[in-house]
Amino acid sequence: MDIMHGDLRRNGSNQSVPSRHGWIDMEALSPLADQSMPGEWSVGLCDCFGDLHTCCLTLWCPCVTFGRTAEIVDRGSTCCMSGTLYYLLSTIGWQWLYGCAKRSSMRSQYSLRESPCMDCCVHFWCGPCALCQEYTELQKRGFHMAKGISSPPHLPTV
């Protein structure tokens, strides 16, 4: 998709980019806009309630949220295997170690900051919030989480 050439410009309060067919409003291209800002998470750690579906899924079935995220981060590991391992580790209170490893992998892939603190601390103290943040980040990057890695990120067409 070759829509951008030239510099990003401010057009009033909206960010716009030039294309072959005129200026494109970046707010209309949110998945693309999110990818163009390396280092920043698209949602905060405590924004769990922004997506009620993800919040409820994570609250009642964290192994499903984790498995779906891990499948995409690992680019093909099965959702069931990762989710089951997460569940088994949660029975002894060690799921945060596995969550920490996946969060680190995800941050490396997408050049995200280790914020608000170290990955292990985030998963130890705020595990459900971390799972929601990671799941939502991948959604905003265009992944259809229920389909997993078989659905590559989709970008809006212009």
From Swiss-Prot:
Check the record and name the InterPro entries matching this protein.
PLAC_motif_containing
Q: Name the membrane topology term.
A: Multi-pass membrane protein
A family per Pfam: PLAC8
Which cell locations does it reside in?
A: Membrane
State what protein this is by name: Cell number regulator 11
Per the record, the similarity remark reads: Belongs to the cornifelin family.
Q: What is its main location?
A: membrane
- In the record, what lineage is assigned to the organism producing the protein? Eukaryota, Viridiplantae, Streptophyta, Embryophyta, Tracheophyta
Gene for this protein?
A: CNR11
User: What residue ranges are annotated as transmembrane?
Assistant: 49-67, 78-94
In terms of NCBIfam families, this protein maps to: A_thal_Cys_rich (TIGR01571)
Q: Which PANTHER family match?
A: DUF614 FAMILY PROTEIN-RELATED
Write the signal peptide boundaries: none
Specify the superkingdom: Eukaryota
Protein keywords: Membrane, Transmembrane, Transmembrane helix
Native organism is Zea mays
Q: Which GO terms describe its cellular component?
A: membrane
